[in-house]
Curated annotation (Swiss-Prot):
This is 3-dehydroquinate synthase. Catalyzes the conversion of 3-deoxy-D-arabino-heptulosonate 7-phosphate (DAHP) to dehydroquinate (DHQ). Zn(2+) binds at E194, H256, H274. It holds the Pfam family DHQS_C. The keyword Lyase applies. Keywords: Amino-acid biosynthesis, Aromatic amino acid biosynthesis, Cobalt, Cytoplasm, Lyase, Metal-binding, NAD, Nucleotide-binding, Zinc. Its EC number is 4.2.3.4. Gene3D superfamilies: 3.40.50.1970, Dehydroquinate synthase-like - alpha domain. InterPro entries: Dehydroquinate_synthase (IPR050071), DHQ_synth_AroB (IPR016037), DHQ_synth_fam (IPR030963), DHQS/DOIS_N (IPR030960), DHQS_C (IPR056179). It comes from the Bacteria. It is found in: Cytoplasm. SUPFAM superfamilies: Dehydroquinate synthase-like. The gene is aroB. It comes from Bradyrhizobium sp. (strain BTAi1 / ATCC BAA-1182). It catalyses: 7-phospho-2-dehydro-3-deoxy-D-arabino-heptonate = 3-dehydroquinate + phosphate.
Length: 382
């Protein structure tokens, strides 16, 4: 069990969605304020904590104690760690446990974990009794800067990533950066890919800052809070403009069309974490943009060098078991991309780049051009 730190001067980011607006509370030790904040938001509620075994070992007892101190009763549902829980079976397990715990519409589901737990618990909350409120307590860097914000919830299908889900906004997000100290180096690096994404899609100055400060972020220095807060502000602004992804919220999928296909082709396994797939996907998107004459080659080099400096995979050949299970099959990758949520009337849509800090939505991309590009990348490094 890990004891929560006391919080000092948290950063508050508002997700401005009218009656469904909520705060993202960021800082070292902010987990300690969870009970007080829930009591102020929803007096008299009961809660159900959904978490995974790894997170539970560090943070379940402290979280239960924080809730109890505020007079908030809680029950617990523990799932297995990893994408293997984001399935029909995983959803059934969580949903039935919530029903057995008699969680009512006015109660709260608390997602205590990384992106998998947040997506799974949020989707269960969305469909339970046609909508139960939930709180995100993200415990991974990826979840703190991306998946906990914006209301996307869901599970995977054998045919693709996040193909079943709902938009269901949390009522509160508690992003305690001290919790990130318990992540493995690989897990932390995977989340960093989503941080870099915000610089690439809309903030060149932030990307330049990341190039200079990534070591301090990784080691837990003061730069970490700034990186998380800047990322959350960027996402909150986009979500406030386009909650349902009918416009520029799609820009947040930079690297994800390639990345999701790579996750699917590796079986949603530990061979490729989501953030690692995004890292490779962003490099592929940059390279494809350059091939189309949209992005200067020097920008591609900067992107590759920065992600590699953090320790992220940047090429298809960096994926464990690259030569196995059809990873080297351009047609299979293209077929998986055809299941991407951005596909409209069977036409592929990609998020590409015109410069570092300027991403664009490219509609009706020629599949033959994508196939030729992938085929070339599969047979050479770089």
């Amino acid at each position: 069990m890990t004891a929560p730190l006391k919080t000092f001067d948290p950063i508050i980011v508002d997700v401005a969605l009218g009656e469904r607006a909520y705060d993202i509370v960021i800082g070292r030790g902010v987990l300690a304020s969870l009970g007080q904040r829930i009591a102020a938001l929803r007096p008299g509620v009961r809660t159900a904590i959904v978490t995974d075994r790894t997170v539970a070992a560090h943070w379940l007892k402290p979280t239960e104690a924080i809730l109890a101190e505020a007079g908030i009763p809680s029950s617990t549902i523990v799932v297995e760690e990893g994408e293997g829980s984001k399935t029909y079976a995983g959803l059934e397990k969580v949903s039935e446990a919530l029903i057995a715990a008699k969680i009512e519409r006015n109660d709260l589901v608390i997602a205590l974990g990384g992106g998998v737990v947040g997506d799974l618990a949020g989707f269960a909350a969305a469909i339970l009794r046609r909508g139960v409120n939930f709180v995100q307590v993200p415990t991974s860097l990826l979840a703190q800067v991306d998946s906990s914000v914006g209301g996307k919830t869901g599970i995977n299908s054998p045919q693709g990533k996040n193909l079943l889900g709902a938009f269901h906004q949390p009522v509160l997000v508690i992003a305690d950066t001290a919790v990130l100290d318990t992540l493995s180096p690989r897990q932390f690096r995977a989340g960093y890919a989503e941080v870099a994404k915000y610089g690439l899609l809309g903030d060149a100055g932030f990307f330049t800052w990341l190039e200079a400060n990534h070591a301090d972020i990784v080691t837990g220095g003061a730069a970490r809070e700034h990186a998380v807060a800047t990322s959350c502000r960027a996402k909150a602004a986009i979500v406030a403009r386009d909650e349902r992804e009918t416009g520029d919220r799609a820009l947040l999928n930079l690297g994800h069309t390639f990345g999701h296909a790579l996750e699917a082709i590796t079986g949603f396994s530990d061979r490729l974490f989501h953030g690692e797939g995004v890292a490779v996907g962003m490099v592929l998107a940059a390279q494809f943009s350059a091939e189309l004459g949209m992005l200067p080659p020097d920008d591609v080099t900067r992107i590759e060098r920065h992600l590699a400096a953090v320790g992220l995979p940047t090429h298809l050949q960096d994926i464990a078991g690259f030569a196995q299970e059809g990873i080297g099959d351009a047609d299979r990758l293209l077929a998986l991309m055809a299941q991407d949520k951005k596909v409209k009337r069977g036409k592929l849509t990609f998020i590409l780049m015109e410069a570092i800090g300027r991403a664009v939505i490219a509609k009706d991309v020629d599949p033959a051009r994508v196939r030729d590009f992938l085929q070339a990348k599969l047979h050479r490094r770089g």
